[in-house]
């Protein structure tokens, strides 16, 4: 097996557990990892540096993009544990080059059978943002196992070795317990040493229908949780067709309507009516048009998007060019909208007669991380792992997420909580194709700001010709003119947040149009993008993650 010099550095670092025992590693321990990288054999861009190394090493050892993504995701549950947990979720978009198909792995858990609207309405008045009651069925593990089974080449044991090396440093109290749990899962896989796929199924059975499921049931039952063994035992990871829309000769893929991703596609439909390149990057007209288009698409998201297995989502109409043509005239280029204006896709009307439901308070959340991977065979993965604010389930070491807070308790609303229902989540990876081949993969952390940032980074590349590094570091903007996706925070009508790097004249122009201007409050950045751009002519894979948001990249 041949290794690049960079790969050997990483392997030497990671194969010395004694030197790292008990030591919290920092970026200085990975001198070859930066926020941007380029190569022709493989590329990874994600959150924690050590997780990026895990993915890069999987590629160097001969694994494909799916193998590398899964290794990265498992490691992120430790390196980025304040944003993503082992009991969390991860929607994944995969381009399988051999089969020439894009598929969605819905790594999203459902509401437990005990999680009813009546329960939360009577006992809580809302779905809590924190604690064990808000835990959905843990879905990340089966999502990753399904990815390895369908597209991968490595075993579960191979995928989690970097994760175990991190856990064995015992930086946090629960690390030792989770390491034991993972090694028990490996022992289950070893019962099928010669059949990789059967071994993966044995791991899934051990977690969802075996000892771990029973331990999670016992702990949740004793500690006020709603999750039970039957919820885990009946969990299924769905493999679905993605949603998509064409845009100026490109095709953009997103997850289904259980996800906020399709609103980015709606926004693109609206923006096709504007010559953004001629209008100029981040010029007042461009920022205004993009913001107003997002407001319209977000209004539809808040009214119609939900689990299609439970409600009839008018997806085809929402993404149609006819509907976009009806809605586009609502954009007044001289004036910021201060009203939420959902449309009527079923009746093909520009504005819905019934006013939208307003929020009732709560807190915003940005507990998410990122992962994009591409390999030399043409496979590409975009994944958005998330899940935190939960609690560690006893000696399992597994932190449960709080994804139920993305549902509501409004009777009759499409996203109202029901047992077995998937929350309408913000986690929204994306792929972009040109002439039938992938040219861009993107993942963004940042709650409701994810697709606002994804839109800008994508258009920075597609319309304005930027490099990945330029695209993720260019000044950004965002609006909170929408219902919050976490505990339904009220909209901030007319709001527009601008990076301070925007020209003074741009601030003044947009304020004159009625936008309520502010600057970012959180460490100077809006959301946290990671992107890979694939040069179809040279085969170069160029990765970049926003350095302000501590994203990391590696390639070889």
Show the residue positions of the predicted features:
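Internal maturation/activation junctions in enzymes
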Residues: 175, 213, 225, 273-386, ...
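Extended C-terminal regions of large enzymes
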Residues: 254-257, 262, 432-449
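Extended C-terminal subregions enriched in glycine
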Residues: 377, 421, 454, 463-524
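Bacterial N-terminal signal peptides
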Residues: 7-16
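Active-site rim segments in enzyme catalytic domains, especially the processed small/beta chain
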Residues: 78-95, 99-103, 225-228, 369, ...
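Short loop/turn motifs at secondary-structure junctions and domain boundaries
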Residues: 235-236, 361-366, 422-423
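Noncatalytic scaffold domains of N-terminal-nucleophile
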Residues: 21-53, 57, 65-259, 319, ...
């Amino acid at each position: 097996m041949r290794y690049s010099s960079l790969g050997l550095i990483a392997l030497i670092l990671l194969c010395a557990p004694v030197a790292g025992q008990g030591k919290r590693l920092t970026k200085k321990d990975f001198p070859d990892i930066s926020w941007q990288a380029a190569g022709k054999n493989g590329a990874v861009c994600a959150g924690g540096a050590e997780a990026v190394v895990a993915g890069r090493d999987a590629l160097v050892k001969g694994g494909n993009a799916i193998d590398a993504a899964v290794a990265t995701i498992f490691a992120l549950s430790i390196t980025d544990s304040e944003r993503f947990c082992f009991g969390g979720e991860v929607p994944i978009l995969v381009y399988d080059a051999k089969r020439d198909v894009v598929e969605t792995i819905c790594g999203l858990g459902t509401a437990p059978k005990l999680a009813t609207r009546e329960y939360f309405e009577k006992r809580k008045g809302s779905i809590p943002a924190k604690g064990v009651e808000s835990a959905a069925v843990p879905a990340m593990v089966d999502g990753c196992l399904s990815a390895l089974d369908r597209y991968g080449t490595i075993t579960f044991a191979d995928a989690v070795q970097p994760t175990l090396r991190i856990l064995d440093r015992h930086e946090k109290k629960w690390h030792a317990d989770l390491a034991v749990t993972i090694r028990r899962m490996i022992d289950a896989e070893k019962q099928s040493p010669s059949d990789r796929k059967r071994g993966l199924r044995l791991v899934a059975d051990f977690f969802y229908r075996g000892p771990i499921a029973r331990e999670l049931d016992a702990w949740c039952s004793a500690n006020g949780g709603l999750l039970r063994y039957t919820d885990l035992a009946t969990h299924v990871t769905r493999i679905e067709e993605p949603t998509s829309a064409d845009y100026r000769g490109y095709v953009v893929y997103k997850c289904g309507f259980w996800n906020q991703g399709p609103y980015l596609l709606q926004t693109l439909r609206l923006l096709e009516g504007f010559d953004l390149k001629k209008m100029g990057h981040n010029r007042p007209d461009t920022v205004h048009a993009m913001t107003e288009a997002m407001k319209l698409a977000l209004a539809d998201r808040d009214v119609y998007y939900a689990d299609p297995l439970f409600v009839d989502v008018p997806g085809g109409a929402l993404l149609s060019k006819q509907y976009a043509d009806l809605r586009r005239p609502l954009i007044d280029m001289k004036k910021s909208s201060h009203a939420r204006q959902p449309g009527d896709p079923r009746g093909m009307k520009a504005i819905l007669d019934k006013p939208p439901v307003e929020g009732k308070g709560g807190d915003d959340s940005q507990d998410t991380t990122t992962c994009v991977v591409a390999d030399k065979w043409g496979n590409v993965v975009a994944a958005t792992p998330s899940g935190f604010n939960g609690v560690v389930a006893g000696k399992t070491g597994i932190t449960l997420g709080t994804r139920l807070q993305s549902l509501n308790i409004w009777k009759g609303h499409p996203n109202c909580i029901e047992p077995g229902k998937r929350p309408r989540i913000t986690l929204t990876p994306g792929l972009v194709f040109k002439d039938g081949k992938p040219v861009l993969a993107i993942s963004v952390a940042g709650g409701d700001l994810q697709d606002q940032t994804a839109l800008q980074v994508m258009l920075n590349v597609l319309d304005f010709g930027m490099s990945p590094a330029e695209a993720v570091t260019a000044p950004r903007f965002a609006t909170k003119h929408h219902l919050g996706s976490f505990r339904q925070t009220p909209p901030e009508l007319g709001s527009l947040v601008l990076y301070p790097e925007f020209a003074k004249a741009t601030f003044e122009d947009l304020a004159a149009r009625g936008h309520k201007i502010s600057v970012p409050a959180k460490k100077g950045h809006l959301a946290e993008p990671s992107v890979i751009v694939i040069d179809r002519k040279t085969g170069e894979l160029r990765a970049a993650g926003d350095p302000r948001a501590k994203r990391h990249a590696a390639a070889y």
